[in-house]
Structures are given as structure tokens and as C-alpha cells.
Amino acid sequence: MEQYHGTTIVSVRRGNQVALGGDGQVTLGNIVMKGTARKVRRIYNGKVLVGFAGSTADAFSLLDRFEAKLEKYQGNLTRAAVDLAKDWRSDRALRRLEAMLITADRETTLVITGNGDVLDPEGGIAAIGSGGAYAQSAAKALVENTELAPRDVVEKALTIAGELCIYTNTNFVIETLE
């Protein structure tokens, strides 16, 4: 059976603001199954943003576990992410999950990979998914050459990714924290 795949998630941090956005397309093989999926959410009483790419069921499983880790560590994003990554690497069932997460709170942005890596992106920009490289490139250019707010950078970066990546559409969900 073919896997559901394809999306673009991008995060931009500038000053005291962070924005995280994603498109809404879910693809099975060469068929668009849904165009309005919500892959970016607020969790932990609205204090943490999370976006996911990869297999939808796998991403929801990881999201549930990540929320539990945030509760365990009282909202400490880094400790929750590292503990989730440890579990991901050591648990046989979790190792088979095919998803990635970008998480952000007021101070920190982290990418959690399927290999169990926790990465703090350089320059305040992170992107994952099939259109991630397009979105990251666009966001980097916009951050370096404009004074746009993070939300505007995310929207423009997703628009560019949506124009270039066949697995990304232009139905965006964008969340911000200040």
C-alpha cells in the first residue's frame, strides 16, 4: 500500500516573534486525498506550536507522545524534545514511524527527525516536508532582505513552495507566538 506523504512546514523566528505554518494537502500516491488538513497546531495551553510532516497517523502518534513529554517536563520544550527523541530511537515500534516535527515556544525552535535527532536550526528558520527546501530558501532570502514579520515571511515562503512542489498547496494554517 502506498504511503500518505507530502507537505511543507516552515518556521521563522525574528526578534520576539515566531511563526509556524503549513499547507493543507494530503497526498496518496499521485492523488490529492484532502486539501484542507491542519498540520500546524497550538499545544500545551497555547504556549507551544507544532507542525508535522510525513505519514499522518505516525505524526499524530508522535504528537500525542510529545504533548505527554511537555506535561512531564512542565513545558520545557528542549527536555521534552530530547526525551521524545530518546524514546523514538530506542523503541522498536516508534522507530518505524515516518514523520518529522517542528516545535517552537517563545524562546526555542527545534526540529525533531525520524532518526531521533533534535536540531536547533540556524538563523531562526526551519522547514520540513517535500516543499521544505523551497520554503526554507524563500524564507532565508526574505529574512535577509526584508523587514517582514515572521508571519508574513512564512506565508510568502509557503506560497513559493506551493508554486513549485506538487505535494504542497496554498491552503495555509499559520500560528504565531510573541
From Swiss-Prot:
<dbReference type="GO" id="GO:0051603">
    <property type="term" value="P:proteolysis involved in protein catabolic process"/>
</dbReference>
<dbReference type="InterPro" id="IPR029055">
    <property type="entry name" value="Ntn_hydrolases_N"/>
</dbReference>
<feature type="active site">
    <location>
        <position position="7"/>
    </location>
</feature>
<dbReference type="GO" id="GO:0005839">
    <property type="term" value="C:proteasome core complex"/>
</dbReference>
<keyword id="KW-0888">Threonine protease</keyword>
<keyword id="KW-0378">Hydrolase</keyword>
<feature type="binding site">
    <location>
        <position position="165"/>
    </location>
    <ligand>
        <name>Na(+)</name>
    </ligand>
</feature>
<dbReference type="GO" id="GO:0004298">
    <property type="term" value="F:threonine-type endopeptidase activity"/>
</dbReference>
<dbReference type="GO" id="GO:0046872">
    <property type="term" value="F:metal ion binding"/>
</dbReference>
<protein>
    <recommendedName>
        <fullName>ATP-dependent protease subunit HslV</fullName>
        <ecNumber>3.4.25.2</ecNumber>
    </recommendedName>
</protein>
<keyword id="KW-0479">Metal-binding</keyword>
<comment type="subunit">
    <text>A double ring-shaped homohexamer of HslV is capped on each side by a ring-shaped HslU homohexamer. The assembly of the HslU/HslV complex is dependent on binding of ATP.</text>
</comment>
<keyword id="KW-0963">Cytoplasm</keyword>
<dbReference type="InterPro" id="IPR022281">
    <property type="entry name" value="ATP-dep_Prtase_HsIV_su"/>
</dbReference>
<keyword id="KW-0021">Allosteric enzyme</keyword>
<dbReference type="InterPro" id="IPR001353">
    <property type="entry name" value="Proteasome_sua/b"/>
</dbReference>
<feature type="binding site">
    <location>
        <position position="162"/>
    </location>
    <ligand>
        <name>Na(+)</name>
    </ligand>
</feature>
<feature type="binding site">
    <location>
        <position position="168"/>
    </location>
    <ligand>
        <name>Na(+)</name>
    </ligand>
</feature>
<dbReference type="GO" id="GO:0009376">
    <property type="term" value="C:HslUV protease complex"/>
</dbReference>
<comment type="similarity">
    <text>Belongs to the peptidase T1B family. HslV subfamily.</text>
</comment>
<keyword id="KW-0915">Sodium</keyword>
<dbReference type="Pfam" id="PF00227">
    <property type="entry name" value="Proteasome"/>
</dbReference>
<comment type="function">
    <text>Protease subunit of a proteasome-like degradation complex believed to be a general protein degrading machinery.</text>
</comment>
<dbReference type="InterPro" id="IPR023333">
    <property type="entry name" value="Proteasome_suB-type"/>
</dbReference>
<keyword id="KW-0645">Protease</keyword>
